[in-house]
């Protein structure tokens, strides 16, 4: 039994492989309990603050439903609902909320903000996404891989294909090296992954048996993979010039049925943290079609809707893994 009580959850860098496995085992057990109606509430009487400086569907719903299932109360502070960083510093906000709440979730911008909250709050702080990292997503991804593959994580070959400089590339690489995986980032040279983070992850890999490969060669990068993973190419709010240059660079890296075939693995799976631009059924999808003539972006519609895609199992597992983080760090054992 691991005692993670009162620990912050800011990045998987802070946890050992055994601790990460504990989160995953607890999430599995909580998922089973929810399905069988045998869940025991370990967060009764707890109050949780959810700070969202960026919009969210899965993360917000996962925290709210997970907390409710476990008997906790939540307060949602949206992009206009708190003064953090505008009228009040992160340190002051942390000291105020830490007096009223038992745990604080933060989804927003720089990693330094969530770290400041954790330093000053005096209660567990959980990272719901920053510009640099997305650790709760990785727990959901790894639980999903466990469910779909009859082998341990350290035997999984995993390729992240697309924008090698974004927070998902960072977060997946950290998680993968901790768990001893064969991890590849397949991305154009013009969009490099953070060199200091790559060096740090290679250091960790030397101790866990993991492998880290950064390549712009798609065929080489996806060969033999169990999982192909991608994320959106551009973020909302980025200027048109960035969209144009990124789309040009990344179009050859769209994950599709042909790329799945290139793995040579009939059991390969496709994953995506969502939302995904795979059709024209959204306002953004329509805009992309009008401006760039593309009906799909980072993943083909065919693959997204195919038997290889496990994206909705992955999305559901956001809730079970986030619940596990709250229970492990805040719950009555």
UniProtKB/Swiss-Prot annotation:
Q: Does the keyword Cytoplasm apply?
A: yes
Where, per UniProt, does this protein localize? Cytoplasm
Residues annotated as binding carbamoyl phosphate: 56-59, 107, 134-137, 273-274, 318
What is this enzyme's EC? 2.1.3.3
Per the record, the domain of life is Bacteria
Could you give a single Gene Ontology term from the biological process aspect? arginine catabolic process to ornithine
Q: What does this protein do?
A: Reversibly catalyzes the transfer of the carbamoyl group from carbamoyl phosphate (CP) to the N(epsilon) atom of ornithine (ORN) to produce L-citrulline.
Family named by the database record: Belongs to the aspartate/ornithine carbamoyltransferase superfamily. OTCase family.
Under which name does UniProt file this protein? Ornithine carbamoyltransferase
Species whose genome carries this gene: Clostridium botulinum (strain Kyoto / Type A2)
């Amino acid at each position: 039994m691991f005692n993670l009580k009162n620990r912050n959850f800011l990045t998987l860098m802070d946890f050992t492989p055994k601790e990460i496995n504990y989160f995953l085992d607890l999430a599995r057990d909580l998922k089973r309990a929810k399905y069988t109606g045998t869940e025991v509430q370990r967060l009764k009487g707890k109050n949780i603050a959810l700070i969202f400086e960026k919009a969210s569907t899965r993360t917000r719903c996962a925290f709210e439903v997970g907390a409710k299932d476990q008997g906790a109360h939540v307060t949602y502070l949206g992009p206009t609902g708190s003064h953090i960083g505008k009228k009040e510093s992160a340190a002051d906000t942390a000291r105020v909320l830490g007096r009223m709440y038992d745990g604080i979730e933060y989804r927003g911008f720089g990693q330094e903000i969530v770290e400041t909250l954790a330093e000053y709050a005096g209660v567990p702080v959980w990272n719901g996404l920053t510009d640099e990292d997305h650790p709760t997503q990785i727990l959901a991804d790894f639980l999903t891989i466990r469910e779909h593959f009859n082998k341990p994580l350290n035997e999984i070959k995993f390729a992240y294909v697309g924008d090698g400089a974004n927070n998902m590339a960072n977060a997946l690489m950290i998680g993968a090296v901790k768990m001893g995986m064969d991890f590849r980032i397949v991305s154009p040279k013009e969009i490099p992954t953070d060199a200091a983070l790559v060096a740090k992850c290679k250091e960790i890999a030397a101790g866990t048996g993991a492998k880290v490969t950064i390549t712009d060669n798609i065929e080489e990068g996806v060969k033999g993979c169990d999982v192909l993973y991608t994320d959106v190419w551009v973020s909302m709010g980025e200027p048109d010039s960035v969209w144009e240059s990124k789309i040009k660079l990344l179009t050859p890296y769209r994950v599709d049925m042909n790329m799945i075939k290139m793995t040579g693995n009939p059991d390969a799976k496709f994953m995506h943290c969502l939302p995904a631009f795979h059709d024209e059924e959204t306002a953004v999808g329509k805009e992309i079609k009008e401006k760039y003539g593309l009906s799909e972006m980072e993943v083909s519609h065919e693959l997204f809707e195919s038997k290889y895609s496990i994206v909705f199992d992955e999305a559901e597992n956001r809730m079970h893994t986030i619940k596990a983080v709250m229970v492990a760090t805040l719950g009555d054992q």
